[in-house]
């Protein structure tokens, strides 16, 4: 940032706004939700450094609590060997060097990790001594007597000196790690951010609105600053009327937000070098609103045309900060006091500052805390004599010094217990020995300890997975002459669907790939008002594919469109009338109460039946229209994302079909049927619906992509072009398309009426097999859902899933990508017949014939960021759901059709809701590639995006040799490390034999059924 200080102020501000994209959430409006790395702005750093930087900047937790990891250790999800190996992997030096007698550093650190470093504060420790048997613990008693604790900092100093030093340190944080709001909250207990948010949120929601706001600011077209300032003159119930002269001051501000910002910033931060840091901290106080405003600023074409500039937002935030802190200072001091005078004010009143600071010391005795709180409350109501502040400060100072006790006796007693030391053993140790023991145990920071636990956690799962792959290597599990080949999305949820299908129909072969199936496109369905991108979010499609009425269906389309438009229009009128009309609203509400109650009872008591009935009635009213694809363009045109080409030329279709089939290794041995199986999710009352859809389709449904690919692959012109390129699809093969609803496990089939008669029997058989597989998959999903039936039959499980999908009160219609942990890139035979618990992304790739790695390079570049984005968003939303996630769905309200808030007054919540991650196990994605280490090394060496992900350890990569099956794990510091472990796995006949009755994560197992 230093170079930016040499630029003119406008360029500096533009540079600062650009830099904010690296620290603020980058979540698109919620209807376009796409998984991404929550810490995308730190991805250029190694994983450990990035987490440390993010925690320092935001205060968020970046690892699971140690207590959760210790629960895993107790339950066997982490073994002692895993923890010991993690110390080696982390790079702790001299692990086998003795520290005290025969105790090595490894022994001491392992004991410290097992016990933990969290000690109760002095107040809690005193209670334990009085109320429990802690005082009788011989180890604790020994250390209370014998351990020489370093005196608490400042214990012998004059309390005025302590107070002044603490006050200077706090003031020094302003502009660096704190805003004035944070300092004043520390002093007063009053948070001006609560008022700021209340003032801002309705204006922000209206300005960013995407179609729901009933009120529009007349000045909205002039930008956010102008619109907000205009409200000071127009709003009869303005939020800031309690502030003296605020309305007049705001109305007389300069018209330019830049001029206002340059006028206000020096009042908050006189040092220009701290301006960016202050703006950054100010933005991070409301990261959701700040991030959405910035996203709309950076993506101007994704709204309704309302001008949105981050400069406007920052100007309003800075102005509010100054106005509200001035008001709080006036009330705090009892008279006008500027921010510039605040340091001197409390430097002259150290006794008052010390009493206020005492309220932030939870270890103080309750009586002293009560007296401090009472005196601060009296100060709010009137004047408090300085003598009272001084008397209480003198009593608080020694207690505050004692509260800083680091709990060494507690920690040393617990550590000794883990090491198996008795008081007799300790008597034989010198003071230097005890100091060395304590120093060694405390040598790891909390972040380092968290990462070591994460390494152990990941290793345990990795060992299970490598054992499974090794045990499965000799099994040739691919059918030689498949009756059908089913191409599904790489999505981890489809791992279960594929496994059950192969158990039911062992002669079916399955493949996995990114769910846009190599066809990046805009799609416009028959009833869609506009086009939608169906491809990875980093891809800009330039082709538009449309769903059109089939020949002879033009009349049906006209009637369908008219009835649908009428239904939607009356729905909208009823909705708006009940919201806005003073008379019609209550009348309509009263008239609709009885049918609304009946509907509510039905959707609550029998949601599945009600949902299916409503869908049938809607279809009967609107009428069904047979459709076809507007697929082929006669000539290529110069296309852009803004002006896309309608359809694809023959050459473009040939190119896309060939590239995709070669990528997944399907170039010969075609079955009679090839099913392209996209996916999406459907549920009710679910603002985060896009988060359950296909990530490779920008959080939309992948069915249209499957349909387009199948239609292209069936065209004679395309097949002729493919044959000329050496890829022959025989006339005995037909492509069909369908979409899997991952929520209710239903299937929507496309264009079956165009299937030639000779394939009809095979299609009917495949329809039955797919339906049976989805029912079996629903039964497996039930085991992780607390409200699902226990060990249900497949039919009952499917009915339960239909009910969940239609239940408006269901916060967990499905679990999404929860528990995702790994990705396999290789032939299906490496994983077919393995129970992987729906935790693995399965991506098809045939290493035979790809000696230079060009094909797998493309797969890694496309699938790597997608899988990493999903895994990392789940990771961070799990470890700190309050900061990186969006809390509970139960309290969410949709705001402006672009996000969710908690209740009616909160920050905009980004990330994943708790119900999506509550069973997730946070770990980095393990990517196993069926290729040699040499080829993968060359690929990473020439691809900076992969270097960032792999060398910075955001994902973990392993190579499985295509011939020998040997597995090597990649470590950026040490290169490729050969794996050698046990390859013994339990074996069962069917998946249900392994998961029935189980509700917790399951280790891999070999499934004997379904493999020929």
Swiss-Prot record:
<keyword id="KW-0997">Cell inner membrane</keyword>
<keyword id="KW-0813">Transport</keyword>
<dbReference type="InterPro" id="IPR018752">
    <property type="entry name" value="DabA"/>
</dbReference>
<protein>
    <recommendedName>
        <fullName>Probable inorganic carbon transporter subunit DabA</fullName>
    </recommendedName>
</protein>
<keyword id="KW-0472">Membrane</keyword>
<comment type="subunit">
    <text>Forms a complex with DabB.</text>
</comment>
<comment type="function">
    <text>Part of an energy-coupled inorganic carbon pump.</text>
</comment>
<feature type="binding site">
    <location>
        <position position="694"/>
    </location>
    <ligand>
        <name>Zn(2+)</name>
    </ligand>
</feature>
<feature type="binding site">
    <location>
        <position position="679"/>
    </location>
    <ligand>
        <name>Zn(2+)</name>
    </ligand>
</feature>
<feature type="binding site">
    <location>
        <position position="491"/>
    </location>
    <ligand>
        <name>Zn(2+)</name>
    </ligand>
</feature>
<comment type="similarity">
    <text>Belongs to the inorganic carbon transporter (TC 9.A.2) DabA family.</text>
</comment>
<keyword id="KW-1003">Cell membrane</keyword>
<feature type="binding site">
    <location>
        <position position="489"/>
    </location>
    <ligand>
        <name>Zn(2+)</name>
    </ligand>
</feature>
<keyword id="KW-0479">Metal-binding</keyword>
<dbReference type="Pfam" id="PF10070">
    <property type="entry name" value="DabA"/>
</dbReference>
<keyword id="KW-0862">Zinc</keyword>
<dbReference type="GO" id="GO:0005886">
    <property type="term" value="C:plasma membrane"/>
</dbReference>
<dbReference type="GO" id="GO:0008270">
    <property type="term" value="F:zinc ion binding"/>
</dbReference>
């Amino acid at each position: 940032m230093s170079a930016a200080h040499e630029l003119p102020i406008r360029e500096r501000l533009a540079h600062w706004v650009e830099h904010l994209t690296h620290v603020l959430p980058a979540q698109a409006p919620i209807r376009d939700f796409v998984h991404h790395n929550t810490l995308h702005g730190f991805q250029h750093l190694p994983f450990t450094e990035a987490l440390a930087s993010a925690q320092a900047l935001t205060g968020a937790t970046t690892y699971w609590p140690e207590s959760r990891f210790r629960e895993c250790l107790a339950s066997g999800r982490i073994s002692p060997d895993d923890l010991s190996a993690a110390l080696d992997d982390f790079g702790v030096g001299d692990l086998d060097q003795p520290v005290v007698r025969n105790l090595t550093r490894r022994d001491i650190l392992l004991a410290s990790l097992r016990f933990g470093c969290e000690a109760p504060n002095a107040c809690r420790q005193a209670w334990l001594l009085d109320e429990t048997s802690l005082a009788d613990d011989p180890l604790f008693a020994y250390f209370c007597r014998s351990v020489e604790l370093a005196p608490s900092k400042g214990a012998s100093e004059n309390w005025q000196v302590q107070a002044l030093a603490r006050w200077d340190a706090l003031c020094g944080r302003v502009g660096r790690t704190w805003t004035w709001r944070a300092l004043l909250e520390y002093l007063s207990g009053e948070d001006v951010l609560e008022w700021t948010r209340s003032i801002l949120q309705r204006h922000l929601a209206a300005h960013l609105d995407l179609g729901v706001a009933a009120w529009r600011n007349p000045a909205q077209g002039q930008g956010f600053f102008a619109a907000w300032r205009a409200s000071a003159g127009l709003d009869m119930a303005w939020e800031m009327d309690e502030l003296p002269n605020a309305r007049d001051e705001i109305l007389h501000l300069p018209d330019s937000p830049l001029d206002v910002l340059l006028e206000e910033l020096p009042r908050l931060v006189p040092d220009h070098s701290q301006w960016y840091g202050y703006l950054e901290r100010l933005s991070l106080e409301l990261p959701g609103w700040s991030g959405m405003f910035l996203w709309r600023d950076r993506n101007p074409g994704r709204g309704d045309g309302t001008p949105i500039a981050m400069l406007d937002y920052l100007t309003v935030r800075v102005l509010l900060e100054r106005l509200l802190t001035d008001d709080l200072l006036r009330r705090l001091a009892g008279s006008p006091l500027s921010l510039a005078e605040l340091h001197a004010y409390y430097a002259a009143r150290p006794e008052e500052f010390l009493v206020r600071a005492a309220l932030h010391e939870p270890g103080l005795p309750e009586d002293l805390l009560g007296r401090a709180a009472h005196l601060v409350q009296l100060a709010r109501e009137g004047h408090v004599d300085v003598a009272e502040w001084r008397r209480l400060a003198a009593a608080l100072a020694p207690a505050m010094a004692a509260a800083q006790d680091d709990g060494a006796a507690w920690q040393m007693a617990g550590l000794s217990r883990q090491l198996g030391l008795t008081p007799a053993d300790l008597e034989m140790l010198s003071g230097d020995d005890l100091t060395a023991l304590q120093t060694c145990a405390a040598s790891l920071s909390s972040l380092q300890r968290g990462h070591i636990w994460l390494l152990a956690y990941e290793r345990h799962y990795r060992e299970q997975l490598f054992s499974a792959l090794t045990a499965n290597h000799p099994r040739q599990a691919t059918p030689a002459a498949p009756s059908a080949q089913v191409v599904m999305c790489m999505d981890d949820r489809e791992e279960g669907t594929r496994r059950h299908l192969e158990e039911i129909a062992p002669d079916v072969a399955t493949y996995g790939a990114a769910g846009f199936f190599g066809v990046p496109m805009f799609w416009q369905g028959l009833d869609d008002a506009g086009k939608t991108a169906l491809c990875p979010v980093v891809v800009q499609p330039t082709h538009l594919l449309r769903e059109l009425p089939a020949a002879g269906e033009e009349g049906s389309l006209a009637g369908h469109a008219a009835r649908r438009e009428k239904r939607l229009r009356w729905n909208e009128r009823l909705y708006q009338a009940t919201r806005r009309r003073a008379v019609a609203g209550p009348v309509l509400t009263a008239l609709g109460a009885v049918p609304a109650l009946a509907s509510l009872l039905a959707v609550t008591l029998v949601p599945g039946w009600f949902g299916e009935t409503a869908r049938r009635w809607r279809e009967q009213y609107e009428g069904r229209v047979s459709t076809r694809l507007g697929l082929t363009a006669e000539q290529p045109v110069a296309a852009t994302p803004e002006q896309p080409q309608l359809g694809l030329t023959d050459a473009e279709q040939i190119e896309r079909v060939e590239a995709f089939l070669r990528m997944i290794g399907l170039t010969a041995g075609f079955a009679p049927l090839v099913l392209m199986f996209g996916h999406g999710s459907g549920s009710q009352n679910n603002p985060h619906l896009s988060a359950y859809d296909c990530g490779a389709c920008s959080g939309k449904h992948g069915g249209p992509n499957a349909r387009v690919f199948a239609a292209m692959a069936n065209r004679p012109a395309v097949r002729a072009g493919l044959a000329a390129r050496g890829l022959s699809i025989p006339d005995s093969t037909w492509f069909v398309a369908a979409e899997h609803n991952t929520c209710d496990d239903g299937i929507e089939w496309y264009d079956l009426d165009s299937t030639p008669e000779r394939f009809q029997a095979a299609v009917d058989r495949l329809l039955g097999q797919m339906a049976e597989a989805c029912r079996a998959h629903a039964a497996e999903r039930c085991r992780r859902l607390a409200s699902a039936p226990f060990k249900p039959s497949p039919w009952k499980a499917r009915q339960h899933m239909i009910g969940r999908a239609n239940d408006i009160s269901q916060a967990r219609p499905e679990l999404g990508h929860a528990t995702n942990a790994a990705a396999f890139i290789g032939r299906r035979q490496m994983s077919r017949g393995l129970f992987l618990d729906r935790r693995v992304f399965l991506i098809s790739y045939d290493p035979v014939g790809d000696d230079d790695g060009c094909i797998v390079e493309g797969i890694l570049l496309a699938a790597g960021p997608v899988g990493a984005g999903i895994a990392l968003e789940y990771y961070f939303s799990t470890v700190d759901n309050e900061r990186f996630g969006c809390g509970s769905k139960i309290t969410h309200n949709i705001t402006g059709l672009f996000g969710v808030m908690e209740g009616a007054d909160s920050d905009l919540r980004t990330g994943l809701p708790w119900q999506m991650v509550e069973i997730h196990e946070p770990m980095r994605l393990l990517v196993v590639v069926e290729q040699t280490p040499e080829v993968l090394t060359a690929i990473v060496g020439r691809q900076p995006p992969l270097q960032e992900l792999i060398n910075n350890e955001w994902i973990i990569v392993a190579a499985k040799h295509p011939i020998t099956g040997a597995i090597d794990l990649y470590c950026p510091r040490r290169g490729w490390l050969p794996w050698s472990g046990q390859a013994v796995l339990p074996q069962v006949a069917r998946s249900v034999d392994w998961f029935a009755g189980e509700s917790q994560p399951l280790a891999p197992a070999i499934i004997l059924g379904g493999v020929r």
